Amino acid sequence: MELPKEMEEYFSMLQREIDKAYEIAKKARAQGKDPSLDVEIPQASDMAGRVESLVGPPGVAERIRELVKEYGKEIAALKIVDEIIDGKFGDLGSKEKYAEQAVRTALAILTEGVVSAPIEGIASVKIKRNTWSDNSEYLALYYAGPIRSSGGTAQALSVLVGDYVRRKLGLDRFKPSEKHIERMVEEVDLYHRTVSRLQYHPSPEEVRLAMRNIPIEITGEATDEVEVSHRDIPGVETNQLRGGAILVLAEGVLQKAKKLVKYIDKMGIEGWEWLKEFVEAKEKGEEIEEEGSAESTVEETKVEVDMGFYYSLYQKFKSEIAPNDKYAKEIIGGRPLFSDPSRNGGFRLRYGRSRVSGFATWGINPATMILVDEFLAIGTQLKTERPGKGAVVTPVTTIEGPIVKLKDGSVVKVDDYKLALKIRDEVEEILYLGDAVIAFGDFVENNQTLLPANYCEEWWILEFTKALNEIYEVELKPFEVNSSEDLEEAADYLEVDIEFLKELLKDPLRTKPPVELAIHFSEILGIPLHPYYTLYWNSVKPEQVEKLWRVLKEHAHIDWDNFRGIKFARRIVIPLEKLRDSKRALELLGLPHKVEGKNVIVDYPWAAALLTPLGNLEWEFRAKPLHTTIDIINENNEIKLRDRGISWIGARMGRPEKAKERKMKPPVQVLFPIGLAGGSSRDIKKAAEEGKVAEVEIALFKCPKCGHVGPEHICPNCGTRKELIWVCPRCNAEYPESQASGYNYTCPKCNVKLKPYAKRKIKPSELLKRAMDNVKVYGIDKLKGVMGMTSGWKMPEPLEKGLLRAKNDVYVFKDGTIRFDATDAPITHFRPREIGVSVEKLRELGYTHDFEGNPLVSEDQIVELKPQDIILSKEAGKYLLKVAKFVDDLLEKFYGLPRFYNAEKMEDLIGHLVIGLAPHTSAGIVGRIIGFVDALVGYAHPYFHAAKRRNCFPGDTRILVQINGTPQRVTLKELYELFDEEHYESMVYVRKKPKVDIKVYSFNPEEGKVVLTDIEEVIKAPATDHLIRFELELGSSFETTVDHPVLVYENGKFVEKRAFEVREGNIIIIIDESTLEPLKVAVKKIEFIEPPEDFVFSLNAKKYHTVIINENIVTHQCDGDEDAVMLLLDALLNFSRYYLPEKRGGKMDAPLVITTRLDPREVDSEVHNMDIVRYYPLEFYEATYELKSPKELVGVIERVEDRLGKPEMYYGLKFTHDTDDIALGPKMSLYKQLGDMEEKVKRQLDVARRIRAVDEHKVAETILNSHLIPDLRGNLRSFTRQEFRCVKCNTKFRRPPLDGKCPICGGKIVLTVSKGAIEKYLGTAKMLVTEYKVKNYTRQRICLTERDIDSLFETVFPETQLTLLVNPNDICQRIIMERTGGSKKSGLLENFANGYNKGKKEEMPKKQRKKEQEKSKKRKVISLDDFFSRK
C-alpha cells in the first residue's frame, strides 16, 4: 500500500525521532548505572500479526486470498464452497466428502483461521435420510465438545455454512419429528442443570422454534455420561447428552441470533426469516410462541381507520422499541440522573459525528453542561440508555442547547454558553435538555435499531437543495462552497442575497434564515418549515393546542407584518389570566416568551413560529382522534411541519473526568527500600539525618576489581561495573554473578536455589550523601522511598534519580516511569487556536493544509489530525514540563550527556514524543504532542485510543472465589454481575463495589500456597480479534487474549510471560484439589481461536495478582489503572523489568513493548464502525422513520471499515458537526468540587427537581436502594470482620494484641473500620426518606439499619457507646414509637409514607424521655487506647 508523500514523511519523521531517543537511551544505559545495559522497551510495528491456518484442500490458499480481496471474507467463504463442490480442487469422491471439506474450509475462512472450530469442533459431516418422514436426504453436522472453545459466533456460522452446502448439493431440509424436538428440549435443560450452566439458557419454546426451522440436523457424539428420558430416537445414535450439539443450538444459533442475522443478510442466504423475527421479538421483550400455538376462534377483520402519519409512527415506535431502563436501575449518590428512559425533554437524539465525538462519545451543547449545575464537564462519563452503555461528553456548539423556564415564568432558548452563565441562577425548570449528537457508527457497533430522526438543520438543507434541483433544475451541494454561477441562478429564483445563500449552504448549522424567509422558502419550494422555527408541537396534546388556539383567537393582541405578500406575526401579547392552563402548553412547545407584569409576550421571530403553523389563526384548530398535533396542522395548513421531538435518550452521570499525575499510594520519588527507618512517610532523608540503619531485603553488588559492596551498579571507588551478589537462603553464603552462573544459580553446599537478594542492613546516610555529591542536589525537604521492594530481584533505583525527581517535584510509578493519567476523548480535526499552537509551528510539524485542501494560513482553519498526534490537557503539559526538566537533569547530572528537551514552558514540548498506555493492556503506542487544551481530557485520534490493547479472559472462564464464606466456582461473567457501580473508561467497563461478601483465591508464588484476597475491581472489555487457547497435559485448558500475562514455572522460579510468548512444553501450575499442593503441568497444545463473545472479562486481585481458573489452573489476572502518557525518553531511560512487582500481573500495565507505526486494521475493531462523512444523506433520515437496522444502511454512510487496506484509511476523514471550541465548557464536574455525600446528594436532587424529564422521587428511591443501603449494610458487615492496624508500621492483625500495642514496633493499634465509617451515609439516607416520596419498605430498611448499628455498638462496646437523646422529629424514632405504642397518634406512619412529615413536631412522653436521659448519663465515651488499657 503506497501512502501519499505527506503521510509517508509523517511516519518517517516519527521513526527518526524514536530512533533519536533510542540512541540517547542506549548511550546512557551503556554506562552501566541501571539494572540492564540495554534499553528494555523493544519496538514493534506489529505485536503478534494475524494468524491464518486454513484447512485444505491442497491449493486452496491462493484462491482464498484472491476471493477475499475481491469480495470480503463472507462472500469468499461461499465462493470457496461453490468451487470445492464444483470439483475445482480435485475429485473428493462422495457427496459427504465434498460436504465435509466445504464446511470445514468455509468455516476456517469465516473465523479467520480458527483451527479448533473447523477441525476439532466438528467431529464429522454426514448425509442422512428423513426415514420417519419422506425418506429425503438431508445434511447432518456432528459436533464435539471442543466446539465450545470456538465461541458462539463460530458455532452459529457453522450451521449457516452447513445450510449453504446443503443447498449447493441439492439436499432437502432436516424434518424433525416431535420426538427429535422434545429430545433436544430435554437435553438443553438437563445439560444446564447437571453439567454446566449455559451462557444462554433458552426456553423450551425457543428450542422448539429453532428445531422446527433450522434446515440441517445439529447433532453430535455423547460428551457426558448423563442419560436422557427421550431414548432411541431414529437417527440419534446415543441416549446420552450431546454437549457439542447443545452448545451450538443454545450458545450459538439462539444466543448469537442477532449477530447471525448480520451474516445471513451479508451472505444472502435465504430461509432464515424466522430468526429475524425471533431477534425482533426478543428486542421488544415479547414471549416466543410457536406458529399456530395460540388458538383463535374469531376471524380478524381489518378496519380502515383515519390515522395521522405521526400518530401511526409513534405507535409503531412504541411497539417496536421499548424504553431501556437498565442504566437507571443504579444511581450513585451525587451523580445525577439527567433523563428517565426515552422521556420527552431528555437528551434529543441528533444523528452525526462532530470532530470531537463518535466512538462512544456524545457531543452536547456546553450550555447544557452549565445548566445541569456543571455536573457535566468536558470528559465526564455518562451511563446511557442507547446506543451503547456508556459515553464520554464533549462540547459541540452547533447543536441545540436547553430550553428553560425562569423563575419569573419566562421561557428562554439557551444555545449560547455566555447566556447560560448569565441566567443559570434564574432557572426554575429545564423543559428540554438539548441535543446529544450521536454517531451512526455507534448504532452499527451496538447493532441498535435506528430511532426516528428528529428534524434538524442538516436534514432541512438536504430537502432544500433537493427541491431546488427538482423545481428549478439548479444543482447545489450542502456543506461546501458552490460555484458562483449556480449560486447566482438559485439566488435569482429564490429572491435572496447571493452571499447569504452561499453561507447557508456552506454552514447551515450556524446560518439560520430569518423566519419570514424560512416561510418564503417553504411556500415556493414546498419543503417543511425550517427546524429552528419548528416548535415541539407533538409534545402538546391536540386538546391543549385547541384550547391555546381559542385563547389566541379571542384574547391575543397580535402585531402583523408582511414579507413579499407573506403575512406573519411579529409580536403577540396575551393576558396571563386568560392563558391559565394554556401557559403550560406554551412552555411544552418550547416557545421562547417573556412574562411582563400581567402579560405574556411572544416577540420576533417566535410569534411567527407559533402562528404560521396555525395558519395565522385563519382556520380553526380542532383535536382529532388518532392524530397528533402535527398531523392536524399538516392536514389543514399550507406550510407543513416535521416533528423535531420524536426520539429522546436517557442518561445518568458516570465517573467524573480525570487528568492527574499518576502516584503510587503513598507517593514515591525513588524505588529504594527504607523499611521502618524512614518512619510512616518512608523519608530517606529523615532516616539519613537521624543516622538510622535500615534492615531491608535488597540486592547488593560487588566490585570485581576493588571488592566494594553496595546497591550501586557502578563502583564509587574505581568506576567498574559491579556484579550482582547471589545469596543462599539456607546458609547465607554469597556468590558473585560470575561464580553463581557457574553453579547454575544453585548453592554448591546446600543444593538450594540462590536468590538475588537478602535481608541486609544499610546506612541511608552514607548512600544519600554519596548520591547528593554525585548530582549536586542538596536542598530537598524529603526523599520518599518505599517500605520494601516488591520485585523478584529487589534491585533498587539509584538514589540520584530520586533526588532529581524530588528537585523537580515529580513521582515515580512501580516500573520506574513517570506518568500522567487522563480520560480519553476522540478528536479527528482541530483549529490551531484551540490547542495554543501557531500556524508556523504546525507547518513545521507537517500540517500544511486544512481539511478541505486549502493552504494553512489562519489559526481558525480546521485541520485534520494525524493518527499518532495527541492534544493533552494543560494540567498534563505542566506536569510533563517538570518531567522533561527531570530527564534533562538526569542526562546532564547522572549520565553526563547533553540535555535533550531544554523546555522552559509547556509549549516547548510540542513535537516531542510520548508513550500512550491504557489499563489492562500490554503494548504502548508512540504519540506526538501537538498542543494543549484547557480541559481535563486527553484528546487523541480514535485510532490512537483504539490501539491501546486489552488483556482478559472469555466470560465463561470459571474462577475460584469465596462468597459469604463458602468456596465456589463462578464464571467471570457471573462474577462481573456480583459487583455494582459500573462505569465506562477507556473502552472498558469497570465495577468496584461488591454486592456480596466476596474474596478470590490467589496463589502466593513465593510460598507456593493458596491464599484468600480481596477483589479490587472487575473488568469487562471489548473482545480482541483472537484468543489463545492453552491445552495442558492433564486435559485441562484455558483461553486468554494474546498479550495476557501467564504465570510459567521456568528454571526453578515463577516467571511471567505474555500469552503469545508461551511455548508448548512450558510448565504451568495446577492446584491439587485434595492436598492444595501445586502441581507442575506442561502445555500440550496452543492454538488461536475467535472470542466466544463480544466481551472478555478479568479482575484485579489485591495481593498476589494471580487467580485460579477452570480446573485449578494458576495464572495471572490482568491489571492496570487509568490511560496514561509518559515522555518517551523518560520511559527508555528509567523503565526496567527488574523493578516490576514479582507477584503482579501489573507487568501488563507497563510499556513492555511499544508500537511505533499505527495500523488502523489492527486496532480495536470498534473504531472501524466510525462514520467519516461530511453529512448523512437524505436517504438515511427517511430510513430512520422505518425503524431500520443500521446494517441496512452501512453502504449509504461511509465508515472507516470501508477504507481499510487503502491509503485513505489514514486521511480524508470528515465530520458532520463543527464546534466553536473543543475546550468550551466546565473544566471540572461539580461532583469533584462538593464535600460530603449529603451535600452531593442534595445538589443531585436539586438538578433532578429542575429537569422535566426526571422524577426526583424515583431518583431518591433508587439512590437509597442501589447505593446508600447496600453501603450501610456492607460497612456494618465489614465492621464485624475487620482487621486491626498499627499506626506506625501498618502491620495488620486479625485479632488485636491484648495490651493494645504492636509487638513489632510498639505502635498504637487502631480499628480499620470505625463507627463513623459505618454510619457516614445514614444521615443522607434519613434525609431522603424524610423529604421524598419513597416506599414504606425503603423507609423501614433505613430505620432497621440504624437500629442494627446502634444495637451492634451497644453490644460490642457498651461503655463506649454514647446514647443520643431521643429526637421526636427523627423519622426512624417516630416509626418505632408508632410501632411500640409510644405515639398514640394514628396514621402517623402513613403520613410519613406520603411525605407529610415536614415541620411536624411531637413531644416524647415525659416518663420515657426521663428514662432515656438517665440511661445516657450512665454511659461514657472512651478512646480505643483507654479501652485496650482497661484492667
From Swiss-Prot:
> Does the keyword field hold DNA-binding?
yes
Region Disordered, residue ranges: 1388-1431
Q: How is it modified after translation?
A: This protein undergoes a protein self splicing that involves a post-translational excision of the intervening region (intein) followed by peptide ligation.
Q: From which domain of life does this come?
A: Archaea
**Any one GO biological process:** intein-mediated protein splicing
Keyword hit for Transferase: yes
What Gene Ontology molecular-function terms does this entry list? DNA binding; DNA-directed DNA polymerase activity; identical protein binding; single-stranded DNA 3'-5' DNA exonuclease activity
Per UniProt, the ranges with Basic and acidic residues bias are 1399-1415
Alphabetic keyword roster: Autocatalytic cleavage, DNA replication, DNA-binding, DNA-directed DNA polymerase, Exonuclease, Hydrolase, Multifunctional enzyme, Nuclease, Nucleotidyltransferase, Protein splicing, Transferase
SMART domains tied to this protein? HintC, HintN
Q: Which Pfam families does the entry link to?
A: Intein_splicing, PolC_DP2_cat, PolC_DP2_central, PolC_DP2_N
Q: What is its EC number?
A: 2.7.7.7, 3.1.11.1
Q: Reaction(s) catalyzed by this protein? A: DNA(n) + a 2'-deoxyribonucleoside 5'-triphosphate = DNA(n+1) + diphosphate; Exonucleolytic cleavage in the 3'- to 5'-direction to yield nucleoside 5'-phosphates
Q: Which family does the record assign?
A: Belongs to the archaeal DNA polymerase II family.
**Role:** Possesses two activities: a DNA synthesis (polymerase) and an exonucleolytic activity that degrades single-stranded DNA in the 3'- to 5'-direction. Has a template-primer preference which is characteristic of a replicative DNA polymerase.
**Record's subunit section:** Heterodimer of a large subunit and a small subunit.
Question: What is the name of the protein in this document?
Answer: DNA polymerase II large subunit
- Native source organism of the sequence: Pyrococcus horikoshii (strain ATCC 700860 / DSM 12428 / JCM 9974 / NBRC 100139 / OT-3)
Gene name for this UniProt entry: polC
